[in-house]
Amino acid sequence: MNNMVSISLCMIVKDEEDTIERCLDSVKELCDEIIIVDTGSTDKTKELARRYTKRLFDFKWVHHFAKARNFAFSKATKDYILWLDADDVILKDDLQKLLLLKQTLDQSVDAVMMPYNLAFDSSGNVTFSSKRHRLVKRSRNFQWIGAVHEYLAVGGKIIRQDAAVTHRSTKTEKSDRNLKIYQQNLKDGKTFSPRDLYYYANECFDHSLYDEAIAHYEKFLKSGLGWSEDCISACDKLAEIFIRKNEQDKAIKAALRSFEYDLPRAEHCCKLGYIYLTQQNIDKAIFWYDLATKLDIQRAENTGGFVQKAYYTWIPHIQLCVCYDRNGNIEKAFEHNEKAREYAPTNPSVLYNKEYFEKRFSKS
């Protein structure tokens, strides 16, 4: 008797001719059903999608991502639903893990949380990731919520799986689509939830509307109703804004404010180290960078928030290299560059430092 679960892939797309085949080729072996919901493509997206599935539906765009995704989910007929964006792929190693999961998944599981790898360094190492409820039981009828930066509201039995979805966008310019949706909602007098406040502030940040971003991050934080990971991220973004505005004291306070919500994260420790280093306060810079080297990335990843892996690996070490070099402790500086080289052996700064130390030591 074959108890292997069946999987529906659900996607919403618009003008994705450059990426949709790459995405579907990477996942077609896993899925028993492919559902594509098109929200108004004017390119060859629909023509390309028809090569993979007959289950292609049109959905009039109403400036609401959750409604489009819920429509796609409503068309699924298999045991579980997998969702992807057209610029996502599943790499071969991750596909093998998911094929095994498909064979062994206990049907009492309601949702599977998986890594979402969003950015990479020049060597292909993951630098920015988060977790997503990526595979969900269809019969639970979980719903998407939110016009923009929508999320899937899940409950019940949730397991973690280390097979990742990889984001591989081909677009170089930041879209202002989400910003315009939020601005129209504001103009229409719609009430923003704490989550809306946070993501609208993020859109303002991404488009360098810093004063507007500050106002909405503050409104979000003062609501006291935000998810702790979003609160931590808001503090980080506030600190970054104040650094860019050359308001260092405010940047320090914003970074420290993140500690109200959880134990320190390496991202914020490195930010504090950076501020103190620019102020030539080397001892304080060393303190914060050193703390970053001692923090557990696994703990951070298990929170479900965004994690910038470089801050848990090579960045604090290369910055400690700079700090100790300025302090005249050449041995310590060399030691930390070697630590950084273990994590990022081809990083240009690491290689430059390696050559620098070789010259220094050859003269002594």
Where are these regions (language model features)?
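N-proximal low-complexity "stem/linker" segments adjacent to membrane-targeting elements
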Residues: 1-26
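Catalytic-site signature of metal-activated, phosphate-bearing donor transferases
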Residues: 6, 66-73, 84, 90-219, ...
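Acidic helix N-cap motif at the loop->helix transition within catalytic regions
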Residues: 18-21, 43-52
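A conserved acidic beta->alpha catalytic loop
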Residues: 26, 30, 38-48, 61, ...
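Conserved donor nucleotide-binding strand/loop of the catalytic core
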Residues: 47-71, 75
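Short aromatic/hydrophobic "clamp" motif used to bind/position activated sugar donors
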Residues: 81
